[in-house]
Curated annotation (Swiss-Prot):
DNA-binding region: 19-38
Protein name: HTH-type transcriptional regulator MetR
Keyword set includes ATP-binding: no
InterPro entries: LysR_subst-bd, MetR_PBP2, Tscrpt_reg_HTH_LysR, WH-like_DNA-bd_sf, WH_DNA-bd_sf
GO annotation terms (biological process): methionine biosynthetic process; regulation of DNA-templated transcription
Pfam family, one: LysR_substrate
Function: Control of the last step in methionine biosynthesis; MetR is a positive activator of the metA, metE and metH genes. MetR is also a negative regulator of its own expression. Binds homocysteine as an inducer.
Family the entry assigns: Belongs to the LysR transcriptional regulatory family.
Length: 317
């Protein structure tokens, strides 16, 4: 059977006018190209061009295949170009990480400058559970620290971050060198309005120790920080979220146990992670976060249905 490479070779021979010139264009030796034509002609059962003709003359069969090359090769080129061009015109994004809005908004603006043709649709809400919506095709990408096993989703790591205990500067726990789960038993833990089972501090610090402090929901980060500063409770937040408040002296942060680390992922439906728009957004958002957020570590290795990696926790390394 004739292959695409044979059509390209025939076209090069027509354009160049001789075996020697065609061989140079194709970065082959003249003898190798001559052998290739002889082998093809033997398999096809007919000659393609007249040897040693000046100017080079193609046989009727060769002319037919040249017409085929002129029709097929441009179509192949156009198809490959279409495959490499973005087919998405809209990117529907949601977050499970309440604190992520602080860096994701400028990351979205930065991405839109380079991909102005892509409509960005950002969905958020304290009662919104985005991963099932992603599975059902209602969203294209979700920022999350939770991996759903056997979900049909692909999780691209964004960055690792430490969850720190956030306290008023004059809180008694601020003087402790080591924070244990029992230290929080009598405290009021201020949390975002999500189920406690989705909180890293609950799943990986308090629950294993059998400690259950009082919980109070707060809608946004700024109010939460103000309540902590007023000794109305304590909180557990990503270090990068509270860095500016800590620098101002409004709050202090402490390491939880040996260090509680989590990883943020960009979740998409498996098989769609290589779509040009999706891939470009994940790369752009990751780079923006790692360039602008303090106390985060870049994480680029793809993860499929794996538990959250927590650097510094030997049981999870």
């Amino acid at each position: 059977m004739i292959e695409v490479k044979h059509l390209k070779t025939l076209q090069a021979l027509r354009n160049c006018g001789s075996l020697a010139a065609a061989a140079a264009t194709l970065h082959q030796t003249q003898s190798a190209l001559s052998h290739q034509f002889s082998d093809l002609e033997q398999r096809l059962g007919f000659r393609l061009f007249v040897r040693k003709s000046q100017p080079l003359r193609f046989t009727p069969q060769g002319e037919i295949l040249l017409q085929l090359a002129n029709q097929v090769l441009p179509q192949i080129s156009q198809a490959l170009q279409a495959c490499n061009e973005p087919q998405q015109t809209r990117l529907r994004i949601a977050i499970e990480c309440h604190s992520c809005i602080q860096w994701l908004t400028p990351a979205l603006e930065n991405f839109h400058k380079n991909w102005p043709q892509v409509e960005m649709d950002f969905k958020s809400g304290v009662t919104f559970d985005p991963q099932p919506a992603l599975q059902q095709g209602e969203l294209d990408l979700v920022m999350t620290s939770d991996i759903l096993p056997r979900s049909g989703l692909h999780y691209s790591p964004m960055f690792d971050y430490e969850v720190r205990l956030v306290l008023a500067p004059d809180h008694p726990l601020a003087a402790k060198t080591r924070i244990t789960p029992e230290d929080l038993a009598s405290e009021t833990l201020l949390i975002y309005p999500v189920q406690r089972s989705r909180l890293d501090v609950w799943r990986h610090f308090l629950q294993p120790a059998g400690v259950s402090p009082s919980l109070k929901s707060v809608d946004n980060t700024l109010l939460l920080i103000q309540m902590v500063a007023a000794r109305m409770g304590i909180a557990a937040l990503p270090h990068w979220v509270v860095e500016s408040f800590e620098r101002q002296g409004l709050v202090v942060t402490k390491t939880l146990g040996e260090g509680l680390w989590s990883r943020l992922y960009a979740a998409v439906r498996d098989g769609e992670q290589r779509q040009p728009v999706t891939e470009a957004f994940i790369r752009s958002a990751r780079n923006h976060a790692c360039d602008h957020l303090p106390f985060v570590k870049s994480a680029e290795r793809p993860t499929y249905d794996a538990p959250t990696v927590r650097p510094g926790s030997p049981a999870r390394l």
